[in-house]
Structures are given as structure tokens and as C-alpha cells.
A protein has these predicted regions:
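Active-site mouth loops of central-metabolism enzymes
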Residues: 3-16, 83-103, 182-197, 255-261
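Short, acidic/polar
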Residues: 10-24, 100-111, 197-202, 262-269
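Extended, intrinsically disordered, low-complexity segments
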Residues: 297-343
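Glycine-rich, aromatic-flanked loop segments that form ligand/cofactor-binding clefts
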Residues: 53-81, 104-128, 148, 156-172
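N-terminal hydrophobic targeting/anchoring segments and the immediately downstream early-domain regions
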Residues: 1-60, 64-77, 343
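A substrate-binding/cap region within the structured catalytic cores of diverse enzymes
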Residues: 88-117, 124-140
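Glycine-rich anion/phosphate-binding loops
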Residues: 38-45, 90-110, 143-151, 193-196
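Second-shell residues forming the walls of enzyme active-site clefts
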Residues: 7, 35-53, 58, 150-160, ...
Length: 343
């Protein structure tokens, strides 16, 4: 089994150093960012290079949520509405919103599938909170847990019908965080009962998802010392036993400023706490080498979840529904008229 880490890479093509490193230390998968995406031909070539080294079925991840978070952006690729648009439609017409968001992510999946990308790090099922930091903002599907659960499920259905697996984030809920976890560690002082009725609810509704990504968040009333990604107590007691999430658990990006310690210590701490796979996004070669040297053995339970995840990704790709994308685009544009302006 490959090493339990997802790596980013530095640019539009692999360097000789990257090729050598990934061959010597094959990661479970890769994640792409804007710095890696210029044209369709270039992205396909980069992905083929990665798969030539690591294996043709290796997961290739991307954050293609719509709105502010689109690693594949116009004019080469389509513009997509921020997720909150579908929550607004849901307030007046639940079924219309559900169908439109499914269609939206079918179209996104089609673009990703054609490039060779097989995992989209979406949906965001954090709640929109008035006091929450704008890092979530319009990425959220709404403020009502049931709404977010229904629409999040439709996102996964849309992606899978297009041959791409989804990933729920940021478990167990980033919405109340008043600071950006890219910059510092958010502290959420809510009690368990309050969190269970709101933040945790969408994750409980989507506990069947194949994959989830942690939030780098401190919940002092659940674990006063460790952020979620490093908290054995929260991962075991809350994510696994209370939320009952059984899929593969990825850390959020280990290089984010919410976390402290060296990058290799962060990686070890995340896996020891119960994350199945670490995520390292920035392409910093020195950091990746430190992670590789620190890589521990994979626990049997993590091996089992990783195997299930890899099979799920392969099955979703193989069972893709063939749809008329032009017809879906017409349907989406018509349904979103007055809510989102396609440029």
C-alpha cells in the first residue's frame, strides 16, 4: 500500500527532483491547485505524469467548490455559483434547489473527469454562522442543518453520477470559527449538546460519505489541549463514535498556520490521533522530504478504510452516467436566472 499522504506539486510540469521523489516515496494521491492548472492539455499531461510514476488509479484531488474556490477557473473552464446560492433557492423551492445543485455538480464532475481528476474536495457542509469568519461565508450551503444535509447529499450524488467522488468538510464543523484556520487556530467554545444540534448535524446526515476532511479547530469543551486534527479524543469519541463516520479521514492541509510544531511532527500527530491520511498541499520540497522520513506504518484499521476508499473511487469512475452536458448547462442556467450571472 502506498504511503498515507496526499501531496501537492510545485508547478505546471513535474521537476526531475519531484519525479525521483514520488517514485521513491509514492503517496496515496495528489492534490492540484491553480498553480498546477493552465490549459486542459497541460493538466491532462501533468496528471498522466503523476500516474505514470505512482499508478494509473491513484486519486487526483482538487477543490472545485464553485464561487471563490475554483482551482480550474475561467476562461479555460466554466464559472460556477457559490454554494450559498442553492441554499437561498432552497428557502423557497426545496426540490428545485436539490435538482439544480445536483446538476451543477454533475457538470463540474464532467469537467474534472475529462481531465483525469477523480476526487473533488466538496461539499463544504459547515454551517453559515453570523459570527463566523468569511473563510467559510458563501462556501456554506446555508445556516440550517437540515438544509445543508439535503443539499450536501445532492452534491455527492451529482459528483458521483459524473464519475467523481466527493469529500465532506470540515468535520466536525468550521462554521462558528471566528478566525481563518489558514492563519491561526480557531477556538469554538460551544458545548457538546449545542454542537450536536447544529454543527455536527450535517455530518451525521452525510456520515455515509466515502471521505471527510478535518477542520483545524480547537473545541475546549471537548478537548482543551488539542485541535481536532491532533485530538484522539475528538476523532474517536466524536467523529467515529458520535457522528459515526466510517469513511477515510484526511487531515486538512498540514502546512496551515492553525497548527503548531514542525511539519513532520504535525504529520505524525495527525496519524497518531486517528487521521487515516495526511494532506500536504504547498509543494514545498523540503517539507515533503521531512514528511517522507517521518512516515509511520499504517494501522490495520486505516488500511481497511483506505482500501474501501480506493475501491469506491474506482467504482464511481467506472459507473459514470453519460449525460448530455449541453442540456445540463441549459437547465442550470435557466434555473439560476436571477440568482447567478454566468459570464
Amino acid at each position: 500500500m502506498k504511503n498515507p499522504i496526499i501531496f501537492g506539486c510545485q508547478g505546471l510540469v513535474l521537476t526531475a527532483h519531484e519525479r525521483s521523489f514520488f517514485k521513491e516515496f509514492p503517496p496515496l494521491g495528489f492534490i492540484l491547485f491553480k498553480r498546477n492548472c493552465s490549459t486542459k492539455k497541460q493538466v491532462i499531461s501533468l496528471i498522466n505524469s503523476l500516474r505514470d510514476i505512482v499508478g494509473e488509479k491513484v486519486p487526483i484531488l482538487i477543490d472545485q467548490e464553485g464561487g471563490r474556490v475554483q482551482r480550474l477557473s475561467p476562461p479555460i473552464w466554466n464559472a460556477y455559483p457559490p454554494p450559498e446560492v442553492f441554499g437561498l433557492i432552497f428557502n423557497s423551492d426545496k426540490e428545485k434547489a436539490r435538482q439544480l445543485i445536483k446538476t451543477n455538480y454533475q457538470i463540474i464532475a464532467s469537467e474534472l473527469f475529462d481531465l483525469g481528476i477523480n476526487v473533488n474536495c466538496a461539499p463544504v457542509i459547515d454551517l453559515s454562522e453570523k459570527r463566523g469568519h468569511s473563510v467559510i461565508g458563501d462556501r456554506a450551503l446555508g445556516s440550517d442543518p437540515k438544509t445543508v444535509g439535503v443539499l450536501g447529499k445532492a452534491v455527492i450524488e451529482g459528483l458521483e453520477s459524473g464519475g467523481v467522488s466527493g469529500m465532506i468538510k470540515h468535520i466536525p464543523g468550521h462554521g462558528r470559527a471566528e478566525v481563518d484556520s489558514h492563519e491561526s487556530l480557531p477556538r469554538i467554545d460551544s458545548c457538546l449538546d449545542d454542537l450536536l444540534s447544529r454543527e455536527f448535524s450535517p455530518f451525521i446526515q452525510l456520515r455515509f460519505a466515502a471521505a471527510a476532511m478535518t477542520g483545524h479547530l480547537l473545541f475546549p469543551k471537548l478537548d482543551p489541549t488539542h485541535p481536532v486534527t491532533f485530538s484522539r479524543k475528538i476523532i474517536n469519541d466524536i467523529i467515529r463514535n458520535l457522528i459515526k463516520f466510517e469513511g477515510i479521514l484526511l487531515s486538512d492541509d498540514l502546512s496551515m498556520n492553525a497548527l503548531s510544531g514542525s511539519i513532520d511532527d504535525r504529520y505524525i500527530n495527525a496519524l497518531e490521533a486517528g487521521c487515516d491520511v495526511g494532506l500536504h498541499c504547498n509543494g514545498n520540497f523540503q517539507e515533503m522530504e521531512l514528511v517522507a522520513k517521518a512516515c509511520p506504518g499504517i494501522k490495520n484499521v486505516a488500511k481497511s478504510r483506505i482500501r474501501v476508499f480506493l475501491k469506491k473511487v474506482a467504482d464511481v469512475s467506472e459507473n459514470r452516467e453519460i449525460s448530455d452536458i449541453n442540456e445540463l448547462n441549459v437547465k442550470l442556467r435557466k434555473g439560476l436566472k436571477g440568482f447567478f450571472n454566468f459570464m
